[in-house]
Amino acid sequence: MQRVKTKQIFVGNVAVGGDAPISVQSMTFSKTCDIEATKAQLDRLYFAGADMVRVAVSDPKDADALKDLKKVSPLPLIADIHFRYKFALIAAESVDCIRINPGNIGSKDRIKAVADACNARGIPIRIGVNGGSLEKQFEEKYGATPKGMVESALYNIKLLEDFGFSNIKISLKASDVLRTMEAYRMLRPLVDYPFHLGVTEAGTLPHSMIKSAMALGGLLMEGIGDTMRISITGELEEEIKVARLILQYSGRQKSGVSIVSCPTCGRIEANLVKMVQEVESRIKHIKIPLQVSVMGCAVNALGEAKHADIAIAFGNKDGLIIKEGKILCKLKEDQLLERFITEVEELAKQREEV
């Protein structure tokens, strides 16, 4: 399905919305005022492939540290503000975007002050609606439902627009798949602002992967979404890896290696799990789109190879390498993997030069 066209904004030098690629972001977990620790996490996310990063602003020390942190950050910075609107006013002097939670930021006057500060610097505001912290009037009327989340978003969008502010992106996050998807679907036809996708508090890696693949992958395939964060109780790099995979398999990102590998069965002669893990590890740096097939026997290998750019099929102490649908060579198992990696890298290089 064609992607929904939205208004384009900029977070630092990263375009969000319009025809810009769907960007990936994460959030540091260090105390933001600890410049050294936070810079180390920013660097990790940069090398993992993040496009922008959010940092928590929980106290005055965090707010005051943003100016120095911005100087050393390799990525655009988003300040995450809850409760204390004055921290947003300080943050607006340094960062590339402000996230506010309508459920706890406070009165209209406070929101206007934040809007004025962001307008002065030309930076966007994310209206970050969370199903677990809706404003009292929406919680009492609708409960923590998609309708309540959408009404909160619409109310705060109108507030900002009334204050002369339209440099906006929106998120509608719940901790479960169905509420998240329904909220985004309900709001999408009503506004043209870019959407930040996410499932909040999604859990550890396996739980978050499944929730995020279902919710975000589903929305992306419907054409909804302009930037995204995968929320994982775990390592920073995993958030970026999972996000990129969801973008790839939803058809919204045409880059990187897509690996097809068979499940294990009684026909397999080689240690397929180990082989697939090694292939993944050694070709993960490749950015050119490639379809790579790793098969444990000949039953489906030739059929899969027709759809792959390059394939390997393990047999009884030997195997085949099949490149662009043709058998390239048959080698002993101890020679097979190294030759395959070489051929994959060579094919990627050839495609890159075209």
Swiss-Prot record:
Cofactor dependency: [4Fe-4S] cluster
Record has Iron as a keyword: yes
Enzyme Commission designation: 1.17.7.3
Function: Converts 2C-methyl-D-erythritol 2,4-cyclodiphosphate (ME-2,4cPP) into 1-hydroxy-2-methyl-2-(E)-butenyl 4-diphosphate.
Family, per entry: Belongs to the IspG family.
Highest taxon of the lineage: Bacteria
UniProt xrefs under InterPro entries: Dihydropteroate_synth-like_sf, IspG_bac, IspG_bac-typ, NO2/SO3_Rdtase_4Fe4S_sf
The protein's annotated pathway: Isoprenoid biosynthesis; isopentenyl diphosphate biosynthesis via DXP pathway; isopentenyl diphosphate from 1-deoxy-D-xylulose 5-phosphate: step 5/6
GO biological process: isopentenyl diphosphate biosynthetic process, methylerythritol 4-phosphate pathway; terpenoid biosynthetic process
Keywords per UniProt: 4Fe-4S, Iron, Iron-sulfur, Isoprene biosynthesis, Metal-binding, Oxidoreductase
SUPFAM superfamilies to which the protein is assigned, alphabetical: Dihydropteroate synthetase-like (SSF51717), Nitrite and sulphite reductase 4Fe-4S domain-like (SSF56014)
Enzyme class, first EC level, given as a word: oxidoreductase
Name of the protein described by the UniProt record: 4-hydroxy-3-methylbut-2-en-1-yl diphosphate synthase (flavodoxin)
Positions annotated to bind [4Fe-4S] cluster: 262, 265, 297, 304
GO molecular function: 4 iron, 4 sulfur cluster binding; 4-hydroxy-3-methylbut-2-en-1-yl diphosphate synthase activity (ferredoxin); 4-hydroxy-3-methylbut-2-enyl-diphosphate synthase activity (flavodoxin); iron ion binding
Catalysis: reaction(s): (2E)-4-hydroxy-3-methylbut-2-enyl diphosphate + oxidized [flavodoxin] + H2O + 2 H(+) = 2-C-methyl-D-erythritol 2,4-cyclic diphosphate + reduced [flavodoxin]
Cofactor, free-text remark: Binds 1 [4Fe-4S] cluster.
